[in-house]
Structure formats: structure tokens, C-alpha cells
Amino acid sequence: MDFLDYQAYGVPLTGTDDELLPEPASNLSLLAASGPSVSELNTSIQGDSTPPLLNTDSNFNFEGKDNLHERMEMYSELTVKLLPIQPGLVRDIFEDVTPQSSDFQHLLKKGNNVTSAVLVKRLSHVLNDMNHPNYQSDLQLKKALMILQDNQGVLGLDGSKLVRPDFLGSLSRKTLRSQLEKELLKDHLATLENFQPIARRIMRLRQPVKNIQEISEKVLDAQEAQNKSPLQDPLVSEVREKLEMLKLKKRVLVGIRESLTLNQLEDEQLRNGEIEDSYLDVLDKMMEIKERSTYLIAMNYEKAGKALLGNINQYLQLANKRIYNYLLGFLYDYESNTKTFGERNFEGDNVGLSLFQRCLVYLSNDLEYFNDFMKKVTSMRSKKLLDEFLIPFVIDNNEGRSIILSAHDPARYLGDVLAHVHSLLANEGDFLKSLFKYQEERMADMTQSIFQKNKDILQSLHVNMLNDIMSTLSNSVRIRLEQIVRFEEEATVTFDISQLLSLYKLMFTKQGMLDDNKLVKVFDDLAVLAKTKTMNYYTEFLSEAVKEEPEVTDLLPPKWLSKYLSDLTALFDKINGSSEQTGIVDKNFFTKLVKTPCESTFLKQAELCFPLAKKDRRVKFDLLVLEINGLDMIVSRLGPYRTNIFSDEYGSEVYDSLKRSLDTLLGQLEVHQTRNILESTGLELYYNLFNMIFPVASVQDPLDYDMYLSAQENQIMKLETIETNIAQKLSDYLPKALLDVQDTWLLYLASPKFADDIASRSFHVFANFYVVFKSVLLNIFPDDHQRINSIFIYSEEEVKMLLGIN
């Protein structure tokens, strides 16, 4: 047992010096101790004779010791025991080292204990250090030591001797090693003895087997020579070829049978197996068999093909029924979990979802089951969606905020309802998309023939399902929204409602709702109704205004026109605030709400207020002032919307038409004002006469005066007549003409700018005619200049000064 020798572990360990365990110290040098000299010791030792071991009276018996090692061990123990001890000498030598030791035996025992403890600690460290370079061999050594320890009683081991570091310990370990080797050899011999009968049989059968081998080689050589012989029988070859052909046909038929039929395991799985991926793999095989059966029919194997096709159809009918039940169970389980744990969507990596979608692909091949399943899903989800829709309308519900109709803000109520429906749509769309929308990465795992055949239906399945489910809410939504639209009279509110409906229609279509969906049609119908209500508000307002008795105060527009324009501009503000005009601003809008009330309703009502306008110039003048005031208010109120509401072609035309009507009325009022001034000064007849000859406004220089020479033939051109008709009126009126025009004629014109412009232009016309008429008279009557100057007492500058013009 050299492997148990402690000196074998004296190799340096990897690591720092601090980690090294202390090694046993060397024997003490007795020569270094104080005591007698070496020569004296030698003399004393030589003087003493070694005691004979065999003649001692001891209990050591060497006769029964056959083992050399045992005899040597006993001899060494006896030698140590009989060694003479000199107490004084030992005490003198070791008193500096071990002052408490009384003899050599005590010193040796204590040294052995200390050394054993140190070595045990070092051995434990070595055997348990995983970083030791010989860790694997250490593990085997540790295992061997543990086996020895477990069998210590059986082997009769003396542990104190085995671990001694001296010669006796080494001798004990070698003895133990030899004993273990003997035991190991005994075990090996016992094992080999068990194989001895087998070896005997092999040796006994070796010669017969060799003979058989030689005979078989001779037979094979003879057969090979016979095959190479030209005398081979053709009948045997023909039979052999037929046999090979039959074997080949058998293999082909077996392959066809396996490709066209289901084995017992597949049949059992199809009928009673659990719906999983392996079940669908069997269905894939059935679909391939069905496709091959059509090939058989096309290859003149009609009977076999039809029989196979009928059998496969029965299998497929059974499989479709089981898949149909599985899909329904999947949805019912989901509904049950929803009631317990709440609504949830399926994740993309859900294994059950992948199986569900694969099953749905297979079921799409059977329209009867597929349509029935879709109807059940639609019915199930519709009921759930309707219940969720009605919850907020219950005042005492505990599941969320209630939606309450307020008379002060119906648009908000309608918006809350639409927002609630949109949230239901979004949630339902996400759920159906997670359940029925096929992802690209999943399509590769599905049966491509079925998927490609029904690709259009399957890829749009979630959209169609969403439209079918949401359509069931159309009546409930219509009931709650239509009453708001029908009973609302305010134009701006109905416009807001139409805007909301149009906006949510757009949002619904972006979520996948189709234009022909019942719910979307409800939004369209209600939006049209809201727009109609908006238009009807203004048309009914105008109808009521026409029925009322016209009231004119200070030639100002009627009150209804001001109220109408306020309501109309409020609508325009709403339209400007929206992102688009939502189709309400069109030709009919401008015709009914702008053109007709302004050009027809107001002007006709104004004419009714002044029935004598065609006969009385004064009444006509007041009518013009009233119409100008009304159109001026209309144009000024609609002016800010010129670049937006009236930006299109027809709107711009309507606005320009109002401007032209206003300009026309201003021109007519200017003409009437000019005639009033001419009439007040007595020059009206002469003004008309001169204009019939040549327009007075076209006179540029004195040469043009000659064109009026023909006017002297008229009786009214005599100086006496002129003096009678003009002199007194002219001298009396001109000083007060400015005040008369501003404070009498144009007093009720609402726009100061229009009043100043009309007065200024009419005064310019009068002053121009005054100068032309006086100059023509001076030219016609050159000898009566003094008389003419007495009639026209004011010069041109004086007239302009009196009239307040430049």
C-alpha cells in the first residue's frame, strides 16, 4: 500500500506560500544537545552489550508468526521495549526541547500524535482540493480509503498502525496491500471459474463448426461455378424473372396501399383521437388521398377512384364534425373563462390559437359546418356585445360611468354614445383579429391547397366577422341617436351632430367597417337627417319671417334679418372650425341660405313696405336707402367668410352678386340724390335737355359747348323763362344744399361712407352742370352776360365751396 504512504503527498501545491500546510519536522539532532561527547557515548555504548532478544523473559512468541512482516514488526517492538534508558542523560539532552517529558517513550508518543494530526489535516486538504492537479486520482484514492474505512471491521485493520509515519507504519501498509491483492486475485479466479464451462463447450464445438464452415465454402463455390456455366436452364431464369417482377409489383401495391389508405392507428386517431397537430397531420394525408382518388378516376380506374373517394368523404365528414365540435368547445371555454377572469386577447405564440386556426382552415372546406360555426360565433359575440353596449345606459350600474342624456348638451350625449360604440368596436376588432387573422409565419404550416383555395375568405374572415357582429347593434344605436337628432332644433347643434356622425363613420371605416354595413348606414342616415335639420332651421326661419308684418324703423333692416345673419354666421364659424365642410356647403346651401333670403325675401319685403315707390320719388328714395342698409349689413356680415366659405366658384358668384346689387342700389341712390338737388335749384329740365343733346359728363373743353347751340330753339331756353325757373331757387337753395342733403335726404343711410360718397358725387355732377349750363348761356347770349350773371350769381369756386367739394 505505497499509495497510503504520507510521503507521497509531499509534492508542492499550486497557490501562494500562505496556503501550504506545514510538513512534519525532521528528527531532533541529539548531537546538538548538551551532554556527553560523542566519544564518551560511543565508549559507554560499546561497554554495554546488546541484550539477546531470544533469551528474554517476554511474551513475544515468534513461532506462530509465518509472515515475515509480522515477525519483523514484533522484533522491532521488542527491541524498542528492551532498549536501556538512562533518565539523567535523556533529561539533560531534551530538557531544552521537551522539558516536561520524563522519558523517550513519552517523547515519541507525543511527537507521533502531533505529526498524525498535521498529516491528517494535510491529507484532508489534498483529497478535498478541487484545484489540485491530481484531483481525479485523488477522488479515486478518497473512494478507496472510504471503502477501507467501511470494511475496517471485516478486514481487521488497525488504523493506528496504518497511519504511523515510521517504518512500522510503512510495513503495515505494505502488508495490507499484499492482503488486498490476494483478495482481488481470489475474486478474479472465482469469476474466471464461472466462465470455464463455457470455454470448455467452445473448445469442444470448435472442430465441428470448422467442418461446417469448410463444407459451406465448398457448396458456395460449386453454386457460383454452376451460375457461370453456359448450360443454365432458361425455364428457371424465366420463373426467377417472374418472381422478381411479382415481388416488385407487391412492393408497388404495398406502397400504393399505404399511400391510399389509413392504417389502424390513423383510423383510430381519426375516430377517437384528441384534436391536436397529429390529428391534423392525418387529415393532411386524407386530403392527399382524396386528390389521388381523382387521378384514379381520370386514369380509367373510375370504379376504384369512386369507391376510394366515397370512403374518404365519409372520413372527412366525421373529421369535420369533430373539428366543428372542437371549435365550439374552444369558444365556449373562452367565454367561461371570460366571465371568470375578464376579456382577453390571444397572444401570437399561443399554441391553442395556432391549432384553432388550423382547424378553421380545414373546416372551411365544408361550407355547411363552416357557415354554421360562423353564425354561432356571430350570435355569441353579438349577445355579449349588446349586453356591454346597454350597461352604461343603466343609471345604477357598477361597471363604469353612466351615459345620461342632458337637455343642455345633446351633442355631448351623442358623442358619448358614439365613443362607447367605438370602444366596443376597437375591442371586438382586436379580439377577432387575434383569433381569426392569419399571420404570414403561420400560413407555411397549413395545408396550402386548402388555404390557397379559400384564401380570400380566410384572410378577410376577421373583417367579415366584425361587420356581422357590429351590424347587430344598428337598431339599438339608431334608437338612442335618432331621437336626439329628430328633436333637436338648433342649427349649430345639428351641425355638430352631423360632424360627429361623419367623424365616427370615418373612424369606424378605418377599423374595418364596410360602407354597406348596417351600423355605418345608420350613421349616414343620421348625418343626412342632421344636415337636413340644419337647412330646415334656416328655411323655416325665413318662412316665418315672410309671414310676419314688416316693421321699418328709421329705414333700418328688419330685426329678423339681423337675427338670421347672426345664426347664419354662427353656422359659418362652426364650418370654419371643422377640418372639412362635410358636404353641407354646396350650391343648394348658397341658394337657400344666402341668395334667396338676401335677394328675394328681404328685397321683396322692402318693396311691400313702400308700395308707392314707383309713383313717389321721395318714397322711392326711402326704399333705396332701406335696401342699401340691408344689403350693406349682409355684405359686411358675410365679408369675413369671403376666402373660406365663399371660396368655391358658386359661393364666390353669390357673394359677388350681393356686392353688385349693393353697388347698383348705390348708383340709383346717387342718381336720385342728384335729381333732388337739380329739382331744388330748378335745373332739372335743363339737365335733361342737355343730356339728350350730349352727355354733360362728357364735356371736356369749351369747344364742346357749341354742341348745345341747338338748344336755344327750345322755349325753355329763353332768358325770361330761365330767370323765372332758376334765379330765385338757385339763390335760396345753394347755401343750404349741403345741410339739406346730409340732414334730410341721407340722414337714414346707415353707412357714413356711403352717405359721403353719394353726396360728394351728386354735388360734383351738379357743379359740373352748373358751369357747363352757365357757359353755354354766355355763348348763346353774348349780349346778355350781365343778365346771365345776375341769374347765376355764384361763380364756380363759390358753388364748390357752398357744396363742400374740391
UniProtKB/Swiss-Prot annotation:
<dbReference type="GO" id="GO:0006891">
    <property type="term" value="P:intra-Golgi vesicle-mediated transport"/>
</dbReference>
<protein>
    <recommendedName>
        <fullName>Conserved oligomeric Golgi complex subunit 6</fullName>
    </recommendedName>
</protein>
<dbReference type="GO" id="GO:0000139">
    <property type="term" value="C:Golgi membrane"/>
</dbReference>
<keyword id="KW-0653">Protein transport</keyword>
<comment type="similarity">
    <text>Belongs to the COG6 family.</text>
</comment>
<keyword id="KW-0472">Membrane</keyword>
<dbReference type="Pfam" id="PF06419">
    <property type="entry name" value="COG6_N"/>
</dbReference>
<dbReference type="InterPro" id="IPR048369">
    <property type="entry name" value="COG6_C"/>
</dbReference>
<dbReference type="Pfam" id="PF20653">
    <property type="entry name" value="COG6_C"/>
</dbReference>
<keyword id="KW-0333">Golgi apparatus</keyword>
<comment type="function">
    <text>Acts as a component of the peripheral membrane COG complex that is involved in intra-Golgi protein trafficking. COG is located at the cis-Golgi, and regulates tethering of retrograde intra-Golgi vesicles and possibly a number of other membrane trafficking events.</text>
</comment>
<keyword id="KW-0813">Transport</keyword>
<dbReference type="InterPro" id="IPR048368">
    <property type="entry name" value="COG6_N"/>
</dbReference>
<dbReference type="GO" id="GO:0017119">
    <property type="term" value="C:Golgi transport complex"/>
</dbReference>
<dbReference type="InterPro" id="IPR010490">
    <property type="entry name" value="COG6"/>
</dbReference>
<dbReference type="GO" id="GO:0032258">
    <property type="term" value="P:cytoplasm to vacuole targeting by the Cvt pathway"/>
</dbReference>
